[in-house]
């Protein structure tokens, strides 16, 4: 038994406070009581959900380059949760590609549902019962698919273009993105002078800011204009109130396009640039403003739409007036303080490669592609995922992260995908990092969209399926589109709404917020459950409840006759998601002591769901029947939702299913021409972390960084896959890949919080602080030689947590406002956990 240690840490010293806590060691029959040190949290520290730390060394959190960007996927992203910019860092011509999350074509619609679905639903199901899959497919195409004329897409806007006059060829050039400060910087020398350019997108001031300066007076000469205009509209140059010289360039137009809408529907868009120069003179020529002999120049860019009924011109004017009343130093300080409050909650150190750490980021990535080890680049990739989450999704964001976040290269929006919200994995992946990465607030705009789906999905449920409750399918837009999509194989994913709604359950599990559970989560879950209780029918042969017609997105199978088919009854992903919905709702009812009648129905239905099944190859079946896969190299593995992010397959509780999941992975990724995309690679990191296979998880993390990530470390969907003619940026690989790193270091989906469950040999020494675990805990971990040294726990709610390391477990009481330190010897003095590893 460990002796009681009475120590409390303060910022500068250690003093005796005489406080202890209780730890109980997990044995096969009981927890044996023991004591360990309880360190009192200094009073000035924030609770776990908002703790900030000033990093001792922020250099690892910088992307930097020795040349300007030539392509969009070389530019550096900045964002404030709504306004995005891709900064090219040009020496003579700076380009910042502007975007805004609500710049959407399309419009709300109440006529998306196919009018024949409800009438022919029973006929489609009977054909599926009779294994007449080709005939059922024909009816699904005719009576279930929707062909919306007003769905829309997020659209790119245009570039802010700065033509910069340099007296000679710039030297000592460097451009960088500091993740800690969220500032993109360009610096170089010309004619003996040093020039600096800083760009950031400010959430407190609702604007994007560009500041140009030199180390001597009167050196700034440049022209400012909009270029590469992608929206219909007009540009005007004017002088703001009280100014004689022109200082404002304004674009006024519309988000119109004809691929995903009718070319006449879309939001009104306004973008205004206010130019503030220290000394010098401004003149207008056509649609640009020229600045001569200024000491410094500050550009304030405001963007607004009428997405939620606002007046874009008024909103832009208000933002510019407020920002223009502040100095650049004040704007910068407000921005960095706001960003630090989120970003500095988590720090990570995975070790270093002294040679690689001195290289520019693009060279480091290519070195990894060539086989070099660079653990610091993996740490940078993790923090980059958090940075992009902060930059793209804030508590006050009007919309959640779309396929491309809040940035837009014009590629996804100009092909069949659209730059929308895909609910068959991509939007979910965008937020897998949020809770564990200590950015819980970033999910707020997602929950708002889920509330919209909950409302609009009620119309789809009754009109398409004749049921109560609500339903949503594979794709959605800002106005809550919930009808099926326009294509077989992907459009009829009937549990898509459930999958995205499960993010609300994760938020509850991490936060323990009973008010959120009662008032936000419960109505959404109850409505979804009411739909599936009415929608599911008994399979005449298997005697279980089934969904259908439904897809296992976006995959297909061979019918008994060899035909290519995709619509079936109760694909495994549907079973996993309905099981999760019902079981979590039952738990919510227990916690809230409500709805006993519905609870009884859910309990009964839960017992009638089909089991997860192992197929003829030893694989986890993707469908209720053991179909032959039509595309065995397919990128989607939707049935493995059961392994991650859900917890229906585990090494301890379902070892045979865990083995089948591994067989599924081996068969899929070893197929010739496996569809290797950014998000499917990120999946592999998380899957193998759950299987506690650290080397495979690390292998696929390296593969993600080296094979599906460009020089700016943004991930992309590879050209030639899923209809993409070229590599197309998607933010899901960044966020889900970063979530995979967290999953390798900390897992809390089971009974215990598991420390270092999948630590690879490539990270022998390191630390991470500020990760969040389910139950309201925040965890710091230090390790050396691949062995735990110290874990530190903070609880924002107070309570008991079970900690597991390797094959041993201990039970820890963590009072609110206390920092409990758990050294390795706490586990060494325990007996083995009964859990099988």
Mark where each language-model region is.
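N-terminal secretory signal peptides
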Residues: 1-26, 39, 52
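C-terminal capping/lid segments that line or modulate ligand- or cofactor-binding pockets
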Residues: 73-98, 102-103, 123, 143-145, ...
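Beta-strand segments within the central parallel beta-sheet cores of soluble alpha/beta enzyme folds
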Residues: 223-225, 445-448, 463-464, 516-526, ...
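Aromatic-residue-lined binding/catalytic grooves and analogous aromatic/hydrophobic interfacial grooves
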Residues: 53-489, 506-508, 526-529, 591-594, ...
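Short, well-structured active-site flanking segments
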Residues: 394-406, 443-444, 511-518, 534-548
């Amino acid at each position: 038994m460990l002796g009681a240690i009475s120590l409390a840490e303060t910022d500068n010293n250690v003093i005796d406070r005489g406080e202890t806590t209780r730890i109980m060691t997990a044995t096969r029959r009981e927890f044996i009581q023991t004591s360990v040190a309880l360190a009192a949290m200094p009073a000035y520290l924030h609770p776990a959900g908002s703790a900030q730390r000033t990093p001792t060394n922020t250099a690892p959190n910088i992307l930097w380059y020795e040349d300007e960007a030539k392509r969009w996927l070389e530019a550096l992203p900045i964002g404030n949760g709504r306004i995005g910019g891709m900064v090219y860092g040009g020496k003579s011509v700076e380009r910042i590609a502007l975007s805004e999350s609500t710049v959407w074509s399309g419009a709300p619609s109440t006529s998306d549902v196919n009018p024949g679905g409800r009438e022919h639903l029973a006929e489609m199901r009977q054909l599926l019962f009779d294994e007449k899959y080709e005939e059922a497919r024909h009816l699904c195409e005719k009576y279930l698919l929707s062909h919306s004329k007003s769905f829309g897409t997020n659209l790119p806007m245009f570039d802010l273009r700065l033509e910069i006059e340099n007296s000679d060829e710039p030297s000592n050039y460097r451009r960088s993105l500091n993740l800690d400060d969220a500032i993109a910087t360009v610096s170089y020398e010309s004619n003996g002078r040093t020039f600096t350019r800083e760009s950031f997108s400010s959430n407190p001031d609702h604007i994007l800011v560009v500041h140009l300066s030199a180390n001597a007076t009167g050196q700034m000469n440049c022209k400012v204009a909009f270029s590469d205009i992608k929206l219909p509209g007009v540009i005007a140059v004017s002088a703001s109130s009280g100014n004689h010289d022109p200082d404002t360039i304004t674009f006024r137009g519309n988000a119109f396009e004809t691929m995903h809408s009718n070319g006449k529907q879309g939001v009104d868009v306004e973008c205004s640039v206010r130019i503030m120069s220290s000394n010098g003179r401004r003149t207008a020529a056509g649609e640009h403003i020229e600045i001569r002999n200024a000491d410094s120049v500050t550009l304030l860019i405001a963007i607004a739409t009428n997405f939620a009924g606002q007046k874009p011109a008024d909103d832009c004017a208000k933002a510019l007036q407020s920002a223009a009343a502040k100095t650049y130093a004040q704007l910068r300080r407000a921005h960095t303080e706001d960003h630090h409050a989120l970003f500095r909650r988590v720090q990570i150190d995975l070790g270093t490669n002294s040679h690689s750490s001195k290289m520019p980021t693009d060279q480091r990535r290519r070195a990894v592609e060539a086989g070099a080890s660079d653990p610091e680049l993996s740490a940078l990739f993790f923090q980059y995922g958090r940075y992009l989450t902060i930059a793209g999704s804030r508590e006050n964001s009007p919309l959640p992260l779309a396929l491309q976040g809040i940035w837009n290269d014009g590629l996804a929006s100009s092909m069949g995908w659209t730059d929308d919200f895909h609910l068959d994995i991509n939007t979910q992946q965008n937020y897998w990092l949020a809770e564990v990465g200590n950015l819980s607030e970033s999910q707020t705009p997602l929950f708002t969209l889920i509330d919209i789906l909950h409302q609009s999905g009620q119309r789809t449920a009754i009109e398409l399926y004749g049921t109560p409750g609500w339903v949503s399918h594979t794709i959605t837009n800002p106005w809550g589109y919930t009808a099926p999509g326009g294509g077989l194989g992907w459009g009829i994913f009937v549990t898509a709404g459930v999958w995205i709604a499960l993010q609300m359950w994760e938020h509850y599990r991490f936060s323990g917020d009973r008010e959120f559970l009662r008032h936000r989560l419960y109505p959404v879950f109850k409505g979804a459950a009411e739909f599936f209780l009415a929608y599911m029918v008994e399979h005449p042969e298997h005697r279980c409840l089934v969904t259908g017609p439904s897809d296992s997105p976006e995959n297909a199978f061979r019918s008994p006759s060899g035909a290519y088919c995709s619509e079936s009854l109760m694909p495994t992903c549907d079973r996993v998601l309905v099981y999760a919905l019902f079981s979590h709702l039952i738990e919510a009812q227990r916690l809230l002591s409500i709805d006993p009648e519905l609870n009884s129905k859910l309990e009964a239905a839960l017992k009638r769901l089909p089991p997860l099944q192992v197929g003829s190859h030893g694989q986890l079946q993707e469908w209720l029947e053991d179909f032959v896969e039509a595309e065995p190299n397919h990128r989607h593995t939707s049935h493995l939702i059961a392994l991650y992010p859900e917890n229906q397959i585990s090494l301890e509780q379902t070892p045979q299913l865990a083995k089948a999941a591994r067989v599924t992975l081996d068969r899929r990724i070893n197929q010739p021409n496996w569809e290797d995309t950014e998000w499917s690679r990120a999946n592999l990191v998380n899957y193998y972390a759950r299987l506690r296979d650290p080397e495979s998880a690390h292998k696929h993390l390296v593969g993600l960084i080296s094979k599906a990530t460009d020089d700016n470390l943004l991930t992309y969907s590879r050209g030639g896959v899923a209809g993409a003619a070229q590599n197309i940026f998607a933010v899901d690989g960044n966020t889900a890949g970063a979530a995979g790193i967290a999953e390798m270091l900390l897992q809390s989906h089971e009974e215990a919080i598991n420390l270092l469950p999948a630590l690879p040999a490539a990270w022998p020494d390191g630390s991470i602080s500020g990760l969040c675990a389910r139950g309201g805990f925040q965890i710091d971990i230090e390790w050396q030689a691949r062995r735990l040294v110290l874990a530190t726990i903070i609880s924002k709610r107070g309570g008991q947590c079970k900690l597991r390391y390797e094959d041993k477990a201990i039970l820890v009481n963590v009072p609110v406002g206390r920092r409990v330190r758990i050294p390795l010897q706490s586990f060494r003095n325990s007996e083995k956990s009964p859990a099988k590893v």
